[in-house]
A protein has these predicted regions:
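Structural motif
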Residues: 16-17
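Peptidyl-prolyl cis-trans isomerase
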Residues: 1-12, 21-361
Length: 361
C-alpha cells in the first residue's frame, strides 16, 4: 500500500462552491490581488527579524507571557483540552512546535527594542519556506479566516450573477494593475511567481467586479440611515480618561480630588504620577458587564473605581457623541453589517465551509 504524503498547509481546502474547492493558497493569492497581503508581509518580516536578533543575542523571553498568550489563544478558540488544541492545529497543518514558535515570534515582535533593519523582500519573490511560515502565522493570527470570508463573498456574488460583464472586468483589471504598480508587459512574470496564469487572474478580477457592483447596489444612503436608526445607542461614542492606581484607597483619593476639589482627572494623575491615558470607544465594544453603567451617562461623569486584578482604574467620561453617517468609523460599521447580512444569505446558497468558520457567523 503506497504511503500517502501529508497534505501541505497551502493545499488544504477551506471552502467549496459547487465542485470547486478553494485552498489556503487560493485565499492568500486572491488577497494579494486585493492588496491585503503587503502590509501583513511587512509586519511578518519585522517580527521575524526581531525574533532572529533576539535569538542571536541569546535574550531570554518571559515564559509566563508566552504561556498567557497560548492560554488566551485556546480560550478564544474554545479549545479546552490539550487534545482539542492538537486536533485544531492538525486540521490546519500546524505542528505544536510551530504553535509555540509563533508566540515566541510575537513576543519578540512586541518586546525587542534593538536596532532593526528588516528585509525588503516582497511576498511574491519569497522562498517557499518563507511563504509557508507566513501562512502558519496567517492561520494562527486569524488573518487567513478573515481573508477566506472576504473571498467567499466574492465567490458567492459571482455564483449568483446571471451574466458576464466585460466592461466591469476591464475596469477592474486596470484598477488592479494601477494599484499593484505592475506594467501590462510585466504581468506574465508576476503571475509566474505565484504559479498562476492569466485565466486565473481574470476569474479573480471578474469575481471582484461582481462583488463591488453588488456592494454599490446595497450600500445606499437610505440603507445606511435605516441601519443606523436601531443602532443609535450601541454606536454612541465615548471618550474616556483613565487613571490606573495600585489600591482602593488611592482610587478613592482620585475620585475625591475630582468630585470635591474640582480637579481635572489628568491633573490628579500628573501630580500623583499615576498612569493616565485617553481612549475612544463605542458602546457596543464595551464589555457587556460594563455597558449598563454607560447607558445614561453624560460628559463629565466619573465612575466609581473598577477593580483590575490587584489594581484599580478610575474612569471619567470626557465626551459623549451620538453616531452620525459623517463619522467614517460609524459608517464603516454600518456598511459591514449590511454587507455581512447580504452575503451571509448568499453563502448559505453557494458556499460550503470545510475548515474555518467565518468570523461573522
Amino acid at each position: 500500500m503506497p504511503v500517502r504524503q501529508p497534505i501541505t498547509r497551502e493545499v488544504r481546502v477551506i471552502f467549496s462552491s459547487g465542485e470547486r474547492g478553494f485552498t489556503a493558497k487560493d485565499v492568500v493569492d486572491c488577497a494579494l490581488v486585493r492588496g491585503e497581503i503587503d502590509p501583513l508581509w511587512k509586519e511578518f518580516l519585522r517580527v521575524a527579524e526581531c525574533d532572529r536578533l533576539a535569538n542571536e543575542r541569546e535574550l531570554e523571553s518571559d515564559d509566563s507571557a508566552l504561556d498567557s498568550a497560548a492560554i488566551a489563544f485556546r480560550y478564544k478558540h474554545d479549545l479546552i483540552t490539550a487534545e482539542e488544541t492538537e486536533r485544531w492545529l492538525e486540521d490546519r497543518g500546524v505542528s505544536l512546535a510551530e504553535f509555540s514558535d509563533y508566540f515566541a515570534r510575537q513576543y519578540w515582535g512586541r518586546s525587542y527594542s534593538g536596532t532593526l533593519d528588516p528585509p525588503k523582500s516582497s511576498y511574491e519573490t519569497a522562498s517557499p519556506e518563507e511563504k509557508d511560515l507566513f501562512l502558519a502565522d496567517l492561520i494562527l493570527s486569524g488573518s487567513l479566516d478573515r481573508m477566506a470570508e472576504r473571498l467567499s463573498y466574492r465567490v458567492a456574488a459571482q455564483a449568483d450573477e446571471a451574466s458576464d460583464n466585460k466592461a466591469s472586468l476591464d475596469n477592474e483589471r486596470a484598477r488592479f494593475l494601477a494599484a499593484a504598480k505592475i506594467a501590462h508587459a510585466e504581468l506574465g512574470d508576476w503571475l509566474a511567481l505565484l504559479c498562476r496564469d492569466q485565466e486565473w487572474l481574470d476569474e479573480t478580477l471578474a469575481a471582484e467586479a461582481v462583488y463591488q457592483q453588488r456592494v454599490s447596489q446595497i450600500l445606499t444612503e437610505q440603507a445606511l440611515q435605516k441601519e443606523l436608526a436601531p443602532m443609535q445607542l450601541h454606536l454612541t461614542r465615548f471618550q474616556l480618561e483613565t487613571v490606573e492606581v495600585d489600591s482602593r484607597n488611592a482610587a478613592a483619593e482620585v475620585v475625591a480630588c475630582v468630585r470635591n476639589d474640582g480637579m481635572e482627572i489628568s491633573e490628579v494623575a500628573e501630580e500623583s504620577r499615576y498612569p493616565f491615558h485617553r481612549s475612544e470607544v463605542l458602546l457596543e465594544d464595551i464589555p457587556l458587564e460594563q455597558q449598563q453603567r454607560f447607558l445614561s451617562v453624560k460628559a463629565g461623569t466619573l465612575f466609581d473605581p473598577i477593580p483590575r486584578g490587584d489594581a484599580f482604574e478610575v474612569w471619567r467620561v470626557k465626551t459623549r457623541t451620538e453616531p452620525s453617517l459623517q463619522d467614517p468609523i460609524i459608517r464603516a460599521r454600518l456598511e459591514r453589517r449590511i454587507v455581512d447580512r447580504c452575503f451571509n444569505e448568499l453563502l448559505s446558497k453557494y458556499v460550503d465551509w470545510k475548515l474555518f468558520v467565518p468570523p461573522s457567523e
